[in-house]
């Protein structure tokens, strides 16, 4: 099995490389409602310099309005963004107490636990926890 360090050191010879995912664009039709949800409901850390950015660890959720860029609003559906948490059942209970509704029950894949829900704009998110420790 390859380690993370093997993957980090791999580089195609003589080519520019993609270094990492810099942010996830969170489409919204109501930026203030989204900021409140990601900050107050999910507990993401707001950026002190950019009101449209919320942080989960090293990942930035960039709240944006596609319609202001001449694009149609389309919620992220069918491939929920996984949010790692220490205990899916406990976090689900916390979010349900704040009014978040989940799609079905929490499920066990044999590798991890997952519970799927959506933000107020319909963008699908997932609470996630793998059994194996992260390297």
Residue ranges and their predicted role:
Residues 44-78, 124-130:
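Conserved short beta-strand elements that form part of the metal-binding/catalytic scaffold
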Residues 20-29, 70-98, 113-118, 123:
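Vicinal oxygen chelate
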Residues 16-19, 25-62:
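Core segments of cupin and vicinal oxygen chelate
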Residues 103-107:
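Conserved S-adenosyl-L-methionine
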Residues 48, 110-112:
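Short, small/polar residue-rich loop motifs at catalytic or cofactor-binding pockets
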Residues 34, 98-100:
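Short Pro/Gly-enriched beta-strand edge/turn motifs at strand-loop
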Residues 2-33, 79-81, 131-135:
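N-terminal beta-strand motif that seeds the catalytic metal site of vicinal oxygen chelate
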Residues 51-52, 108, 135:
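Residue-level "edge-of-site" marker
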């Amino acid at each position: 099995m390859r380690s993370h360090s093997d993957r980090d050191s791999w580089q195609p010879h003589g080519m520019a490389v993609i270094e990492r995912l810099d942010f996830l664009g969170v489409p919204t039709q109501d930026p203030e409602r989204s900021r409140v949800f990601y900050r107050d409901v999910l507990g993401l850390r707001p950026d002190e310099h950019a009101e449209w950015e919320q942080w989960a660890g090293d990942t930035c959720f960039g709240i944006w309005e596609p319609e202001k860029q001449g694009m149609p609003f389309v919620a992220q559906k069918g491939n929920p963004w996984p949010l790692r948490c220490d205990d899916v059942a406990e976090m689900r209970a916390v979010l349900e107490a704040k009014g978040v509704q989940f799609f079905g029950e929490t499920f066990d894949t044999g590798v991890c636990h997952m519970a799927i829900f959506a933000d107020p704009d319909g963008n699908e998110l997932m609470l996630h926890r793998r059994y194996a420790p992260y390297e």
